[in-house]
């Protein structure tokens, strides 16, 4: 055994390439929570409401000369009174929670073919835990059991979105 130390092996080949993405800031762009029936709903609600969730992701370049984008993950959660009879239409709205959660991101040397999936899949995947927490807290603070959003397949959402024409300015 000797007292000399061996230089560390070259691990450069084992290091994965850096993600060409920097999240500059995350923020609540818009938040709304409404109980249309007011206090009456707390006295008359007899069963767990039916909850519908709608999700959308938008991405827009903020400056033409810089690779800086705003990505917005929009969630609308609407709870309706359960139908009184099997197969009947749901009742009145119990609550409506809407959240538009934004992130300003910079892409550095991202290949052109990866820009769209990074913006519409990877960024929403990274900010989703914050969105999930906000929706849960808002519904709980509104006097209802917290709505815990289940994981979202952003790849499938992106692929479905690609099958429809896009409006100008969206990634």
Curated annotation (Swiss-Prot):
Keyword Cytoplasm carried by entry: yes
Stored SUPFAM superfamilies: SecB-like (SSF54611)
Superkingdom of this protein's organism: Bacteria
GO molecular function: unfolded protein binding
InterPro entries documented for this protein: SecB, SecB-like_sf
One Gene Ontology cellular component: cytoplasm
Entry's family note: Belongs to the SecB family.
Function as written in the Swiss-Prot or TrEMBL entry: One of the proteins required for the normal export of preproteins out of the cell cytoplasm. It is a molecular chaperone that binds to a subset of precursor proteins, maintaining them in a translocation-competent state. It also specifically binds to its receptor SecA.
Protein name per UniProt: Protein-export protein SecB
